[in-house]
């Protein structure tokens, strides 16, 4: 019976600590941070899977599906390629003297004039596209002894045969085609683009019928360059009723230079020049519709917002656009490390601090206090720590955008079949650049995320240290982000701790007195198990001694007989 009494005493003593915490002479103050039930997973330098309370997506992965016509001037090419509009194909006359920021070529575009090729198609297309205008100035070339304004049934302008409006097809006059030698100086202060051509007849008969000579020659030169083209006579696949071809060439004449044209046949002469302007106009192949809206960034898929630093829509862009990366998602942490709140905390539902878990429900603040005292429980935010963290995180997204947004366009690059190896090299270089940028983007975001998490953890620790320095010996660090305050601390007292006006000297004597009284009977949780086990072992030992003594007493009285057989 004595053993049972002793065990009951120790058990009650072990539990007395829990109940003593609710004593009116003490209080508990816990520090915590914001938490959400379901956070967002982000990457850091040290961890690929870390949960935060909030994060912002940095990769734009979808377009509007339409091209916005503001603030950029968009010219819809409709049925005309840029080169057809440049040459003056009859069905492209509407584009004469047009200007643009972005010329949109459609997959439905077609040529509807004499079949031609441009040996340096990509360069001419890029040159005209970047110039941003089809402004054309007619000049008075003098072509003596030849017939001008040749036409073809393959190039109808209305019911009659026609030709490219910016070119002049010269043929024999009567039975002669004299040697032509024409000069045209550039007396202006800008570059001039002259477009000209050479006709390749399908047969020798066609050659002599048009130009008399069995073989023609065209030479176009300036002080800086010279091009000599000899026609290639021969049959080619029929296109719009023609097996002959025209090759289109171009020459840029600088201010103060002179254009010289020399030919004895097969010349497709220029009628004037195009003004070359330097700018950031461009061209893009796209079938996206053009709509009235505003967007700084345009891709072949349509316009996209540029409020993110990266995009995964298309590597061809125009305008101020996010940098293209391979990743479909990169999340920037804009909140702290998330530790979801535990819903059950044992029999007594004690409050807990940030080391155990976060607190849900702190919508307006990231850091705060919870307390338990004689007046009940409560919670309040710490605006100072919250604002300190937010100030450092705000602007992080804008800084990333400033570092990565391209203020120029990434144009399409085209090469002829002869330049296939250059095309392969260009593709390799572009792929390498994309790989490098994708890696840099992931590294940049991981670094920023690491900084954000370290920053928010640091602010939590600063708040804890600030509180600990205020309380000093009046409270004890419970090791879970909480303090046990050894004096009566009502709501006004708790508020003074939160706002930094707490005076520990006022409560020092009461706290020391209560600490000694409580410590006199308080058993630390670390010793409870030891005492219980020692009590149990002692009880068992005493029980065995009593049982052994009883057996020996009974044997002496003869009440118990023990026989040992060998």
Swiss-Prot record:
Any Pfam family hit: Hemagglutinin
Topology of the protein relative to the lipid bilayer: Single-pass type I membrane protein
InterPro entries xref list: Capsid_hemagglutn (IPR008980), Hemagglutn_HA1_a/b_dom_sf (IPR013828), Hemagglutn_influenz_A (IPR000149), Hemagglutn_influenz_A/B (IPR001364)
GO CC terms in record: host cell plasma membrane; membrane; viral envelope; virion membrane
Disulfide bonds: 30-482, 68-293, 80-92, 113-155, 297-321, 489-493
Residues spanning the membrane: 531-551
PTMs per UniProt: Palmitoylated.
Glycosylation sites (chain numbering): 23-24, 38, 54, 181, 301, 499
Compartments, record wording: Virion membrane; Host apical cell membrane
Cytoplasmic face of the membrane: 552-566
Keyword annotations of the record: Clathrin- and caveolin-independent endocytosis of virus by host, Clathrin-mediated endocytosis of virus by host, Disulfide bond, Fusion of virus membrane with host endosomal membrane, Fusion of virus membrane with host membrane, Glycoprotein, Hemagglutinin, Host cell membrane, Host membrane, Host-virus interaction, Lipoprotein, Membrane, Palmitate, Signal, Transmembrane, Transmembrane helix, Viral attachment to host cell, Viral envelope protein, Viral penetration into host cytoplasm, Virion, Virus endocytosis by host, Virus entry into host cell
GO biological process: clathrin-dependent endocytosis of virus by host cell; fusion of virus membrane with host endosome membrane; fusion of virus membrane with host plasma membrane; viral budding from plasma membrane; virion attachment to host cell
Signal sequence range: 1-16
Marked site: Cleavage: 345-346
Stretches of the chain found on the membrane's Extracellular side: 17-530
Lipid-modified sites (S-palmitoyl cysteine): 555, 562, 565
This protein's record includes keyword Transmembrane: yes
One Gene Ontology molecular-function label: host cell surface receptor binding
Record keyword Disulfide bond present: yes
Predominant location category: virion
Family named by the database record: Belongs to the influenza viruses hemagglutinin family.
Function: Binds to sialic acid-containing receptors on the cell surface, bringing about the attachment of the virus particle to the cell. This attachment induces virion internalization of about two third of the virus particles through clathrin-dependent endocytosis and about one third through a clathrin- and caveolin-independent pathway. Plays a major role in the determination of host range restriction and virulence. Class I viral fusion protein.
Quaternary context: Homotrimer of disulfide-linked HA1-HA2.
Additional free-text comment from the UniProt record: Major glycoprotein, comprises over 80% of the envelope proteins present in virus particle.
Name of the protein this chain belongs to: Hemagglutinin
Organism encoding this protein: Influenza A virus (strain A/Duck/Memphis/928/1974 H3N8)
